[in-house]
Amino acid sequence: MKFDFRRVDQLPRLAWCATLTRGHDSVVVHHGPWVETRDDCFFEAAWDGDFRAGRFDEAATMLGTGARIDGDRIVFSTATDTDFYLFSVASGDTLIVSNSLAFAMVQGKTSPDIRHPYYLYDFFALRRTGLTRDPRRLRTADGKRLNVHMYQRFAVNQRLDIEARAMSHQPLPVSFDSHVATVRMTMAAVFENAAHPGRRYPFTPITMISRGYDSTAVSALAAKLGCRHAITFSTGELGYDDNGADNAARLGLSVTTSKQFDFQRLPGHPEAEFCASNPSGSGMLIAGLSQQLEGRILLKGDSGDFVWSLSEIDAARDLRRPQIRALATASMNEFRLRTGTLIFDVPGIGAIHSTAIHALSSSPEMRPWSIGGTYDRPIPRRIAEEAGLSRDAFGQEKMYGANLAGDEDTLKPETVADFDRFYAAANVPWSFRQRHRYLRRDTLTRPVDALLEYLRDTPGAAKLYKRFAPWLMNVTAHRANDWRRLSPYLYLFHWGFDQTKARYEL
């Protein structure tokens, strides 16, 4: 097998799309200008291993994606977190693989199915069921097979046979010190790889920080490893001030403070690429930071909600997230491909061992760092306090930094108007347009809410919750927010694709 690289400077910097044809040993790869290419591999990635060796497909932690020749096969590698995927479209004698859902659809000559508004819940189902159902198929307008590959390495030969490859993992944590040592060593290795002088385009770290547990702990670790700059937002989703600037200063970090809705000042429809990445589009608050994030590793703490949680429900195997209700980071993919940004979800290091990490959080060793209440995470608290932050400086109240796409107060007025035109002209099923189909589902939402709340709060019922919650949530189109008034905005994914596809038309 061999690569036929075709650089296209007009593509987003980190985007790539590989075309494999049955019986041919040459794989055509169209790619943006920042994708690193070698005779035997290509990647837009940093990993916890030697850069020159290029064995990212053996790494336990990998930011970004890539592919490498292994004899008579091409091995494709996804990111090792659960927010960024590879997408494949199979049609006849051709297989398309890309790190962009829009790119895969355009080159696969397909598009979202306008008869299917529920892509949001397809992605929720992917996260809620984890590795127990991978890859997951998405519907397309013409019925072509489009798969989403999460936390996966897979090999493809000339016959287009696909073979799953084993993933590498970090060691099982047995104590706080061993867990944090693994996280710290992994971060250091990734930073070294990302800054290697052999790169045409190196990456340097920048960290998100708020007053919450996870981003504060991540920033404390990053500061000790040479990270010098942080980003914070001054207002949370519900009007709370979640500004982490004071803590950033205490950690020795310079900080850029942005208001949550600054992206609304941008021209055009900056929300579109977020909606095209993931139907929630809720990571759009970073749209106004594109210049600050060029050539950066953006450090985030999102998966701390699960990995560092004390809730037994969150201690799920196979990277399942039974009660996940937000997909903010997953909606940032098109943005990061365009700006040239790698995203590092630090609590996700070793997340495959979430049951062991949960046991550690609940252990006697960690009790001095447990403050009680519903918002209590001993591991990130200990990390931050041992870095010099006071107990009352963070982790006091859960706030939400992500925006919910589909709210007229969130989207730009110009975007709302453009979406309304798209929705009015689209061949949306009559039953959905009249909301009959949605309301039929919604009649189940309240009793399902009551059942899930009972299972969540009943001692000993966590196993039942983890088993049945993902299925119940998706059958009822369950969402934390009131989708009865937002249901047309489930079509933001279709609109986002329509707005974004031109960047991938070669």
Regions of interest found by a model, annotated:
Residues 33-35, 45-49, 53, 322-337, ...:
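Long, acidic, intrinsically disordered low-complexity segments
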Residues 158, 165-387, 401-414, 459-463, ...:
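ATP-dependent adenylate-handling active sites, centered on carboxylate activation for C-N bond formation
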Residues 1-25, 434-506:
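Membrane-proximal basic amphipathic "stem/tether" segments
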Residues 312-313, 391-463:
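PAPS-dependent sulfotransferase catalytic core
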Residues 1-263:
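Cysteine-centered catalytic environments shared across enzyme families
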Residues 102-118, 127, 371-391, 432:
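Charge-dense polyanion-binding interfaces
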